[in-house]
Amino acid sequence: MDKLDGSARLMIVSDLDQTMIDHNDPKNLSLLRFQALWESEFSQDSLLVFSTGRSPISYRGLRTQKPLITPDITIMSVGTVIAYGEEMIHDVGWAEFLSNKWDRDIPERSQGPHKVSFFVDKEGAREVMDSLPETLNRRGLDVKIIFSSGEALDVLPQGAGKGQALLYLLKKFNSDGKPPNSTLVCGDSGNDAELFSVPSVHGVMVSNAQEELLQWYEENARGNPMMIHATERCAAGIMQAIGHFNLGPNVSPRDLEFPYPKLDAIKPADVVVKFYVLYEKWRQGEVQKAPFIIQYLKRITHPNGTTIHPSGRECSLHASIDALSSCYADKQGKKFRVWVDRIVASSIGTINWLVRFDKWEMEGNVRYCCLTTLLLTMKPETEDGFEITHIHKTWLEGYSAGNEHACIL
C-alpha cells in the first residue's frame, strides 16, 4: 500500500454484510452517511479495509448492487484472499503462506482456493466443528473451522482467517515503518471474532451482532475497554465507535443542517462531499426550495468559472447552477442517491487545489459515474473560505447516461 507517505491516522477494518451494509435498510442511509464521513474526513490520510466472508466473485457482485466506495484493501473469503486498491491486486505472498499443509481442487465457483464453505443447521454445527478438524488432520491437513451467521461453516487453513489476515497486514505496515496510529475493527458475526483478538486494536460489535459473536464476547472480552457493543446498527454503529474511542470526527456531512458552518481549516475533500450532498438533497427535495441555496452555490463558484460536461460541451458554472435550480425535487421518491468515491486532492501552489474523484448518481437500479476533476481556490477572507473555479467531467466507461440531465454538476 503506497497511498500514504507515512502511517495511517486511522485504519478501519470492517465486515460488510450486516456490519458496513445494512440489508434491512433499502435506502442505504447508514452506509451513505458513513461513506460521506470517510471521504470528507479520513480518505486522505487513513485506510479503509473491507474484510468479508464473500468470495471475490460475490464481492464484485455486491458492488454492483450497493453504493459502496472503493476500499484501500479488500480481505475476502474469510481472510484467505488479500487484494489491494481498485484493481484488486492479490497479495501473492499471503496465498503462498496459506498453501502450507493445504491441498484442494476448486470444483465450485462459490468456493475459494483456501476456503471450503457449507451451510449447516445450528444444532449440527457443534458436532461438525468438534469432529472435522481431527478427521482432516489425519489426512495431513491443518485446518480451522469457523461458524457464523447461524448457518455458515467455513473450513480454512490454520493460518487463515480475518484476524490472521489483519495481523499479516499490520506486520507489513510495521516492516515498512508505517504502522497505523489507530485501528478500529468492526463486525457482527462469528467469523469476525478473530478481528477482536488482534492486540491493541479498538473494536465495535454493531448493535445487531449475532448470537455467536455475543457469546464469544461474553466468554473472551467482557470488560475490555478497547471493545464496545454499539447501540446503533451497522455503519451507524461504526460512526458511534469512532466517537466513543476519540478516533476522529464522527458526524457525517449528510447529518449537517444547511447552511453549513464555516470551518477554521477548509479541507478540499470535505468541500467536494458537502457540495454533492447538497446537490442530492436539492434534487430529492430534502432541503427547502429557497433562493439562498442557489445563491450559496453561486457564491462558492467563480462568476467566470466553467464546467465541461461529459459530452465535451462547455458552459459556465453559474449556468449549470441555474439549470439545477429548475430541477428541485425532480428525483423525489425515485430512490435517487449521489456519492463520491476515490477522492485525491493535490496542492498546486499555495492556495489552489486539484481534486479528482468519481461522482456517482444512482436512481433505482440504474447508476451513472463521471470521472471528475475540480479546481478549488482557498479564500480564507471570504464568507465560505473557498471558491470552485472549474469542473471537468467524463463518463466512466460502462456507466454513461443518455442525457446530460443526469449529470448537471
Swiss-Prot record:
UniProt entry tagged with the keyword Magnesium: yes
Listed GO MF terms: magnesium ion binding; sucrose-phosphate phosphatase activity
TM ranges: none
EC number, as in UniProt: 3.1.3.24
Pathway(s) the chain acts in: Glycan biosynthesis; sucrose biosynthesis; sucrose from D-fructose 6-phosphate and UDP-alpha-D-glucose: step 2/2
Keyword Ribosomal protein: no
Group of enzyme by EC: hydrolase
UniProt-recorded name of the protein: Probable sucrose-phosphatase 3
Organism of derivation: Oryza sativa subsp. japonica
Gene: SPP3
